[in-house]
C-alpha cells in the first residue's frame, strides 16, 4: 500500500530539514451565517472554544443577524455553546484565561470574564482614567491583562483571581502612537515580571515595573510583532516588508526574510518555535528558520489561532491545523524512508496481503542493529500517539503489536498507555465534543485540566469515563455536576433534588453534597438544601464507594 498517499506525505512541506503539514479537523457546524471578515475572533489555547463578535469598525450589510449583535462562543467544531446579547460597549480585545474563561476588554477599562456557557463570572475596572482617555491597545495572557491608554499610561492585572490594577511607568508622549504591542508573560520573562513591548517609531520600548528601556533599533516602523511561545524570540514585520526575527533580549539578529510586500499582514503568529505564519487576504505564508517558505492560498477569510505546537486555521467553513510533522511520523511515512519503523509497517502490509516476505522483512529489521525491532515498535507507537486519523492510528498499533510478537522481552506497558491515550483523544475529538487536542498539547495542559474543561461544558459522563481510563480523581467532576444540577433544578423541590443528587453521588463515589454546594443552593434560593448540605459536611454518613457512571 502507498502509505505516503494515505498519510498525505506527498503534500508535506519541507522547510530546511523540517516537514510541515496541514490537516483538516472539522467542517464547521455554524453554517453560512458566519463571515470572519466582519468579526472579532478569539480562540482559546489547547484546541479550545472560539469567541466571535461582530466588529463594529467593519462595514456590514444590514440583516436580521447584524441588527441583533451578540457575543457567541463556539466549540472548535463550530457548535454554538453560548450566545450573549451584546450591549456592554466597545470591545478593544478578547482572549482566554488558563481556566478557559473568556476575557473581554472594553474601551472604558472594564474587563469582563465569561464562562464557556455564557455566564458573567467576574468583572472589574482598571481605573477611572480609562473612562476619559480610553483604552488604545490591550494584551491578554493566561492569568492577566495589560492596557495602554490614549494618554500612554500602562495599567495591568497579573492575577484574575485577585484583580488589583497596578501601574507601569508612563510613556513620554511620542511623536506617533505605538504601531503594535506585545507582551512577555511573567512566567517567561527573565525578570519573572510582566514585560510590555511597544513598537514606537523606528525602535521598540521594553516596559516593566522597573522602568522603560529603549532598545535602540533602527528597523522600524514595525507593523506587527509576535513573541514566541517560549518567550525567547520576537518576530517582526517591518515597514519595508521584511520578516525579522530577533531574540527578546535584543542581543541577536536571528533571521531576515523579504516578503516583497509592504502591505502589513492581518496576522503574524508563531507556529510552535520553529517558524512564523503570516496571513494576508486569501494567502497564508509560512517562513522557516533558514529562509525557506511555503504559501497556501484560500478563497475565504481566515483567522490564525496559535497553539504550542502549531496554528489552527479557521475559515468560514473549515478548521485546519498547520504544524510540524512529528519526528516519529516522518521516520515512518517519509517518502523513501528505510527506517526500522517504516520497514515494520511494510512487514504488516505484507502480512495482511498474505505475502511470505513479511518474515524476511522482520529478519532484516533485526539485522539492522541489536535493538532494531524494539526501536521499530517504539517508533510506530509514538507515531500513532501523534496521529489524528483513526485508521492510521489503528494500522500503526497493529504494526507495533506485530513487531512486539517477535521480541523476546515484551513490555506491554507502552502499548497499553498509548491505546488508552488514543481512546481518550479520539473521544474528545468527536465533533459533538469539539476538542481537537494533540498529544503535545495534552502533555502541556495535563489530562486533569482537560477533564475539568469537559466538566465545564457539561460533558460530565465523558469526563468520568476519562477519569476511569486515565486513572484520575473523579471527585472534581462529581462536585461540578452536583452544583450544575442544583443550578438547573427548576421547579423540583429541595428534598426531591437532594435525594436525586445523593443517589447519583452514591453510584460514583463516597462523597455527599460538596460543602460549597450550600452557597450554590443559596444563590438560587434553596435554603433547605443549603442547610442539608452543611449538615452533611459536619456529620458525613458512611458510604460505600462503587465503580459506576452518572447517566
Kindly give the residue locations of the regions a language model identified.
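Extended non-globular scaffold/tether segments
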Residues: 2, 8-26, 30, 253-260, ...
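WD40-like beta-propeller blades
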Residues: 1-275, 279-308, 324-345
Amino acid at each position: 500500500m502507498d502509505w505516503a498517499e494515505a498519510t498525505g506525505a506527498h503534500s508535506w512541506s519541507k522547510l530546511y530539514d523540517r516537514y510541515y503539514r496541514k490537516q483538516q479537523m472539522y467542517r464547521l457546524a455554524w453554517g453560512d451565517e458566519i463571515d470572519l471578515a466582519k468579526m472579532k475572533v478569539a480562540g482559546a489555547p489547547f484546541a479550545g472554544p472560539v469567541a466571535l463578535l461582530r466588529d463594529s469598525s467593519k462595514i456590514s450589510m444590514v440583516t436580521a443577524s447584524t441588527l441583533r449583535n451578540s457575543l457567541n462562543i463556539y466549540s472548535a467544531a463550530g457548535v454554538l455553546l453560548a450566545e450573549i446579547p451584546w450591549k456592554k460597549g466597545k470591545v478593544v480585545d478578547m482572549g482566554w484565561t488558563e481556566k478557559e474563561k473568556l476575557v473581554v476588554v472594553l474601551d472604558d477599562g472594564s474587563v469582563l470574564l465569561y464562562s464557556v456557557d455564557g455566564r458573567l463570572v467576574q468583572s472589574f475596572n482598571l481605573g477611572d482614567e480609562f473612562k476619559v482617555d480610553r483604552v488604545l491597545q490591550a494584551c491578554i495572557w493566561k492569568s492577566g491583562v495589560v492596557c495602554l491608554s490614549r494618554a500612554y499610561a500602562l495599567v495591568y492585572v497579573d492575577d484574575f483571581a485577585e484583580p488589583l490594577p497596578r501601574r507601569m511607568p508612563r510613556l513620554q508622549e511620542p511623536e506617533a502612537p505605538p504601531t503594535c504591542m506585545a507582551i512577555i508573560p511573567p512566567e517567561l520573562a527573565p525578570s519573572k515580571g510582566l514585560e510590555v513591548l511597544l513598537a514606537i517609531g523606528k525602535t521598540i520600548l521594553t516596559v516593566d515595573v522597573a522602568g522603560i528601556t529603549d532598545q535602540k533599533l533602527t528597523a522600524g516602523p514595525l507593523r506587527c510583532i509576535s513573541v514566541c511561545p517560549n518567550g525567547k524570540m520576537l518576530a517582526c514585520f517591518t515597514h519595508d516588508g521584511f520578516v525579522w526575527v530577533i531574540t527578546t533580549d535584543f542581543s541577536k539578529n536571528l533571521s531576515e526574510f523579504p516578503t516583497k510586500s509592504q502591505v502589513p499582514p492581518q496576522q503574524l503568529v508563531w507556529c510552535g518555535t520553529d517558524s512564523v505564519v503570516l496571513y494576508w487576504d486569501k494567502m497564508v505564508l509560512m517562513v522557516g528558520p533558514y529562509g525557506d517558505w511555503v504559501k497556501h492560498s484560500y478563497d475565504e477569510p481566515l483567522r490564525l489561532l496559535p497553539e504550542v505546537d502549531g496554528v489552527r486555521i479557521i475559515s468560514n467553513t473549515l478548521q485546519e491545523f498547520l504544524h510540524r510533522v512529528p519526528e516519529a511520523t516522518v521516520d515512518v511515512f517519509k517518502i523513501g524512508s528505510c527506517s526500522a519503523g517504516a520497514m515494520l509497517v511494510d512487514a504488516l502490509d505484507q502480512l495482511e496481503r498474505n505475502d511470505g516476505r513479511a518474515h524476511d522483512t522482520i529478519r532484516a529489521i533485526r539485522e539492522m542493529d541489536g535493538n532494531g525491532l524494539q526501536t521499530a515498535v517504539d517508533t510506530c507507537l509514538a507515531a500513532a500517539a501523534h496521529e489524528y486519523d483513526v485508521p492510521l492510528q489503528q494500522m500503526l498499533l497493529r504494526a507495533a503489536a506485530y513487531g512486539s510478537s517477535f521480541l523476546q522481552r515484551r513490555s506491554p506497558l507502552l502499548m497499553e498507555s498509548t491505546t488508552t491515550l488514543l481512546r481518550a483523544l479520539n473521544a474528545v475529538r468527536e465533533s459533538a465534543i469539539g476538542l481537537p487536542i494533540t498529544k503535545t498539547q495534552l502533555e502541556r495542559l495535563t489530562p486533569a485540566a482537560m477533564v475539568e474543561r469537559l466538566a465545564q461544558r457539561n460533558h460530565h459522563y465523558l469526563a468520568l469515563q476519562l477519569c476511569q481510563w486515565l486513572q484520575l480523581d473523579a471527585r472534581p467532576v462529581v462536585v461540578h455536576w452536583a452544583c450544575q444540577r442544583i443550578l438547573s433544578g427548576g421547579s423540583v423541590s429541595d428534598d426531591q433534588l437532594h435525594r436525586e443528587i445523593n443517589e447519583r453521588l452514591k453510584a460514583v463515589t463516597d462523597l455527599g453534597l460538596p460543602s460549597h454546594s450550600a452557597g450554590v443552593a443559596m444563590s438560587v434560593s434553596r435554603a433547605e438544601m443549603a442547610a442539608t448540605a452543611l449538615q452533611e459536611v459536619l456529620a458525613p454518613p458512611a458510604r460505600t464507594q462503587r465503580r459506576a457512571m452518572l447517566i
